[in-house]
Amino acid sequence: MSRRKQRRPQQLISDCEGPSASENGDASEEDHPQVCAKCCAQFSDPTEFLAHQNSCCTDPPVMVIIGGQENPSNSSASSAPRPEGHSRSQVMDTEHSNPPDSGSSGAPDPTWGPERRGEESSGQFLVAATGTAAGGGGGLILASPKLGATPLPPESTPAPPPPPPPPPPPGVGSGHLNIPLILEELRVLQQRQIHQMQMTEQICRQVLLLGSLGQTVGAPASPSELPGTGAASSTKPLLPLFSPIKPAQTGKTLASSSSSSSSSGAEPPKQAFFHLYHPLGSQHPFSVGGVGRSHKPTPAPSPALPGSTDQLIASPHLAFPGTTGLLAAQCLGAARGLEAAASPGLLKPKNGSGELGYGEVISSLEKPGGRHKCRFCAKVFGSDSALQIHLRSHTGERPYKCNVCGNRFTTRGNLKVHFHRHREKYPHVQMNPHPVPEHLDYVITSSGLPYGMSVPPEKAEEEAGTPGGGVERKPLVASTTALSATESLTLLSTGTSTAVAPGLPTFNKFVLMKAVEPKSKADENTPPGSEGSAIAGVADSGSATRMQLSKLVTSLPSWALLTNHLKSTGSFPFPYVLEPLGASPSETSKLQQLVEKIDRQGAVAVASTASGAPTTSAPAPSSSASGPNQCVICLRVLSCPRALRLHYGQHGGERPFKCKVCGRAFSTRGNLRAHFVGHKTSPAARAQNSCPICQKKFTNAVTLQQHVRMHLGGQIPNGGSALSEGGGAAQENSSEQSTASGPGSFPQPQSQQPSPEEEMSEEEEEDEEEEEDVTDEDSLAGRGSESGGEKAISVRGDSEEVSGAEEEVATSVAAPTTVKEMDSNEKAPQHTLPPPPPPPDNLDHPQPMEQGTSDVSGAMEEEAKLEGTSSPMAALTQEGEGTSTPLVEELNLPEAMKKDPGESSGRKACEVCGQSFPTQTALEEHQKTHPKDGPLFTCVFCRQGFLDRATLKKHMLLAHHQVPPFAPHGPQNIATLSLVPGCSSSIPSPGLSPFPRKDDPTMP
């Protein structure tokens, strides 16, 4: 450990030898080095000390101010024994008075030497000064503020302190003085500790700063080259001095700089952070400035630069290798990036000085190891181009401009994607791939178009407003405030109100118009007759208009907002009224426009019919000008007319897809499917809700309440326990459809079922749908995880839910339902089911139940016929039940519940797992999947095997969030997997093929 880190290393010797030396008065001078009273330099050789006194001409820059000093002579002359604290107090007191020199005393005070050595090793910092800085020859050794000391300028140095009071009489006990001395010692130790912490912080910051640059420092100037320093100075380690001198004071001499440093020496925080807020290449007085620039050519020493290269000093950072640059950049990159953002002027190099400015430090930190870091948010990018694109998100710069509509984009790729919208309308216009400065949007070219535009804005509006060419835009009818500005602009153009805004440029009229339009634009549904009354009311508010214009002239918005235009009625002095890019009509206005356009098209159709022209079908909202299947409200292009109709229903808030289990309605079939899977994966809820009258089980409480109301209303007889599960569910669902269908629910009739082509295109549209109702899918995530460990349920509970659902829901869940039916056939004895009712009771069912059952059955049969064998439902139906037995009949009819799995029309049952197959070949292929020691169930996603199906279900629900698709092996298994959300037919697992391997079965 160095002497600076020790706590008073010579204190014990001072306490032991002090009294004897002072009593004898013959202490040797070589044991106690002599200290200069002016510069506080200490020497062990008296000859060197005398030579230094002759050359030293500087007043002491440091004055230690501690109260309660004692006279060194009196304390040394005292022969009474003193405690250790008292001796240390005298050591601190002697520092206030001038130390004895060789001329005034034959032997210095015994307490001065050892203590002074400890103080010098812990507090003194030597700096080599240039000879030219002081204006002449002679070296200078400065001392940093002592521990617990305050540096003062020479002119403000106070007079020597008054002599301390004499020591107490011998009669007073030493215990009376222990308490104040101990407190004084504690205060000194505290100040010393604070000073050491400050110095440690400064050293760490300097090491990180210089280590981040990855530079190596040359050999420092040897002590022998420093003029005016003796041989004793070579034994002292030279440490860097962290001077708080400001750069504005560097033109003065070093003596004046040291004196001015005392003004800011009382602010250690600013001193510690000084080098972080000033460029390294600036005229900075502290010695590390030269170290930071040592990798560049060394400039000649200058009188105005006290921090030049002859102040190179050995510092602790020399021991650190150059590899600390990346670590330091990672530690300080974010903080300095924020500093660079706060002071952008520092990002540039110095004015041709060839020195490293602070901006260069930042640029080197932005690219640690070839990476590029954002100076605003400290994100790191792999290339400079990516960093520049990212910086545009902070600056708001959008350099790429569409030359058709004037919209701006941050990247060229976004502009390319946007420009595809204009390809159909403007095939002859080429996209401008080059950046267009935003300030050029203010310029109107000789052709009358804004700079960077290839198509007049009004031309695009005319095409959009032609009959059958999209929504016809009405001229904006602004409110009183906006019309006041418009009328005033008319006065400005005619010169009648030039006194309001004299010399106003032409384009500023457009700017003034848009300054009030975004917040005062009236709804497009305003009747045309109200425009004249509004203008008449404006004529009475001329003074308010002029006051408003005077405010608008002082706050003009950007001209970039004036590139999207609307047609005007001609009453304005300019050809069109501008509309900002961000401003758009409300959804209510868009719907009103759509209704008006449909009414106009209907009126045209009626007129053509009256005149004998051939009639057309019901007008579609889309048009040729806006694309074959483009929404005129949000300009979205859809895949087919059916998808467009569903899309318009979403704009209108329609929810035609209704869940028959809980009654919730959804806007898309995809949302309904996702919601219904939540019902399928929550078997625990089925045992919780049962009817108290007929003991029928339901999925949720809402359906149970409706069922109980039907019991109380007489719609269901109290002997409903004799009803079959399938029939009861159908009756419940049919009654629920009549009682709980809301105004936004429109189930499609059977005659309007979509074709397979439209169904596929509609599913594509559902994949593109962005406005998903996330809350509708909460049951999929929540209930799926709750029922992970539950056993497989029987088909009776599943058919209770599916029997009354629409054909859309039945299509989506047909495969899981069929598989669960096969599963239940195997484990039917293990589940508690109500006894199947006898056939005569089925004849007593009310008519609504039979009608609902027949409707659903017919709908599902119709869907199966339309889709043919391409439908997974049809494939599974043919394989699972035979071509002569429909799926609905197997699910809902009571006779199907009585059938044994092996009794249905030649079906073959597996002896191991109990599944039935239509042919012997399929059964043999299935039996190959069973190992010899028993059934093994394998996950199709991760190929993990399980001994029972329940464990596999839990694994697939928890690990893969999928519904286990238990289907017979073969090509239809892949079709079943395609119905599972998130599962495709091509599962990326090693060695998985559509047909299961013999040695690696998938599932029974």
Curated annotation (Swiss-Prot):
The modification Phosphoserine is found at residues 243, 794, 799, 803. Disruption phenotype: No overt phenotypic abnormalities. Histologic analysis of the eyes reveales a colobomatous phenotype, with delayed apposition of the optic fissure margins and persistence of an anterior retinal coloboma phenotype after birth. Deficient embryos display correct posterior closure toward the optic nerve head, and upon contact of the fissure margins, dissolution of the basal lamina occurs and PAX2, known to be critical for this process, is expressed normally. Anterior closure is disrupted with the fissure margins failing to meet, or in some cases misaligning leading to a retinal lesion. InterPro entries: Sal_C2H2-zinc-finger, Znf_C2H2_sf, Znf_C2H2_type. Residues 756-779, 800-809 have a biased composition (Acidic residues). Residues 731-742 have a biased composition (Polar residues). Its main location: nucleus. Residues 83-98, 820-829, 896-910 have a biased composition (Basic and acidic residues). One of its GO terms (biological process) is eye development. One of its GO terms (cellular component) is nucleus. A zinc finger (C2H2-type) spans 34-56, 372-394, 400-422, 629-651, 657-679, 689-711, 908-930, 937-961. It is found in: Nucleus. PANTHER family: SAL-LIKE PROTEIN (PTHR23233), SAL-LIKE PROTEIN 2 (PTHR23233:SF15). This is Sal-like protein 2. It comes from Mus musculus (Mouse). The lineage of its organism: Eukaryota, Metazoa, Chordata, Craniata, Vertebrata.
